[in-house]
Amino acid sequence: MISRFCLLFLLVFVVSKIQAVEDFNEENEVDDLDDLDFLDDLDLDLSPEELEYLENWAKEFED
């Protein structure tokens, strides 16, 4: 009986850890896509061309 409880507890623990890792990875992917969104909030009066240049530069920098 105790061994069944331990196995069940271990299974629930492993599943919850896997779910936490998946959630963390999804959050990081979203964060990576939104890295340059702060530029919109800075009131820098960037033209669309300048903003596109910065976004392309950031993508090249990541590679």
Swiss-Prot record:
This is Anionic peptide 10.1. The lineage of its organism: Eukaryota, Metazoa, Ecdysozoa, Arthropoda, Chelicerata. Expressed by the venom gland. The keyword Secreted applies. It is found in: Secreted. Its main location: secreted. Belongs to the non-disulfide-bridged peptide (NDBP) superfamily. Long chain multifunctional peptide (group 2) family. GO terms for cellular component: extracellular region. It comes from Lychas mucronatus (Chinese swimming scorpion).
